[in-house]
């Protein structure tokens, strides 16, 4: 099956969320902070969470870690399950980019949390970078929301990826969820992670 087949065939499930972090290498960063918030609050227990992982070993590791949560599943990047999830999840949360073939459906909500504060040249601010930059530009342009920690990041992303005036979504200068997770962690939370 191809992505185009799944795109045409599958309906969007309003209670499903897909999370992707750096091509599925880990469960970290702002998508993970959002996931933890949603799984810990009763109001969101109806949601099903699907995480993208990069390999069978990563898949098995996280399945074991989250086996107590029946509403959490994992898909290996570029698998049929991944293609299906890309076309059926209502909410898509990514800290980088989805593949170049990805096309957001009209009734999907794409939240890009990006993964840092730009203190270097990026995007089209780097000479001769159009080919390397085009998928990132496209991902930003199709996102509904870009989460930004501050005005500096908003300005740099907007300029480096030439988003204005064509970007139809919204920059949310609300800080990165990952920082809330860090600041609000208790000593017990930290000890559990480190053990």
Model-derived regions, located:
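Glycine/Thr-rich phosphate-binding loops of Rossmann-like dinucleotide-binding domains
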Residues: 27, 101-102, 120-121, 156, ...
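Helix N-cap/beta->alpha junction signal
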Residues: 53-55, 96, 149-152
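Hydrophobic/aromatic residues located in beta-strands of well-ordered beta-sheets
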Residues: 49-51, 110, 146, 171
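Extended catalytic core of nucleotide-activated donor transferases of GT-like folds
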Residues: 32-36, 41, 67-135
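N-terminal pre-catalytic "stem/leader" segment of glycosyltransferase-like enzymes
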Residues: 1-82
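A nucleotide-sugar donor-handling region in carbohydrate enzymes
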Residues: 123, 135-195
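Structured loop/turn residues at beta-strand edges in well-structured enzyme cores
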Residues: 12, 87, 105, 141, ...
């Amino acid at each position: 099956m191809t992505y185009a087949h799944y795109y045409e065939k599958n309906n969007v499930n309003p209670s499903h969320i897909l999370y992707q972090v750096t091509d599925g290498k880990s469960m970290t960063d702002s998508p993970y902070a959002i996931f933890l918030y949603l799984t810990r609050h009763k109001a969101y227990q109806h949601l099903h969470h699907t995480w993208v992982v990069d390999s069978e070993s990563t898949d098995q590791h996280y399945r074991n870690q989250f086996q107590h949560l029946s509403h959490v599943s994992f898909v290996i990047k570029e698998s049929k399950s991944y293609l299906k999830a890309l076309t059926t999840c209502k909410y898509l949360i990514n800290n980088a980019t989805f593949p170049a073939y990805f096309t957001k459906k009209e009734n999907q909500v794409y939240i890009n949390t990006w993964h840092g504060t730009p203190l270097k040249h990026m995007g089209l601010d780097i000479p001769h970078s159009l080919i390397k930059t085009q998928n990132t530009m496209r991902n930003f342009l199709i996102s509904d929301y870009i989460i930004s920690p501050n005005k500096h990041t908003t300005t740099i992303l907007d300029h480096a990826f030439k988003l204005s005036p064509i970007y139809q979504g919204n920059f949310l200068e609300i800080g990165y969820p990952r920082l809330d997770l860090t600041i609000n962690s208790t000593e017990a939370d930290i000890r559990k992670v480190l053990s």
